A protein has these predicted regions:
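Conserved C-terminal portion of the radical SAM core fold
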Residues: 1-34, 54-65
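Terminal RNA-binding accessory module
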Residues: 38-147
Length: 147
């Protein structure tokens, strides 16, 4: 509450210096029982919305640059689920928490797979599984252990 233009600029400078690629950002709203509810909030909703847009835009830009830097790299990906949009495609998270999409005939949900990043469009990362035979053996072994 009550963030000045100077304080907001300091926040923006910090975000640029650290080079955040993700952030959960929202407009301040008082929460009952918290110390912040006692502070004066003289920032208009219009300014709050403008600042949030600016902050989210810079983080989005930084995220796109970071995602593009992954192109051509090999990433270890923990497979989370099937794509709801594309048949035969799965997605998972790399160690940097970026979501990676890839095609597979095998179901590797819950397994790690090695993926070569082959394209990045805006902030959407696509790749191809490498070492698929090794991963299939690992998957089958995990399934046998579970029985």
């Amino acid at each position: 509450p009550g963030e000045t233009d100077n304080e907001f600029q300091e926040t923006m400078d910090f975000i640029c210096d650290v080079n955040f690629t993700d952030a959960y950002s929202f407009i301040y709203s008082p929460r009952p029982g918290t110390p912040a509810t006692l502070e004066k909030d003289d920032v208009s909703m219009e300014i709050k919305k403008k600042r949030l847009r600016e902050l989210q835009n810079i983080i989005r830009e930084q995220s796109i640059v970071y995602s593009k830097s992954m192109n051509g790299t090999h990433q270890r990906v923990l497979v989370e689920n099937r794509s709801k949009k594309k048949f035969g495609e799965y997605f998972g998270r790399a160690s940097n928490n970026k979501i990676v999409n890839f095609k597979s005939k095998e179901n590797y949900i819950g397994d790690f797979v090695d993926v070569e990043i082959t394209s990045v469009i805006k902030n959407i990362v696509h790749g191809e599984i490498i070492n698929q035979n090794f991963e299939k053996e690992k998957h089958n072994t995990r399934a046998k252990i579970a029985k």
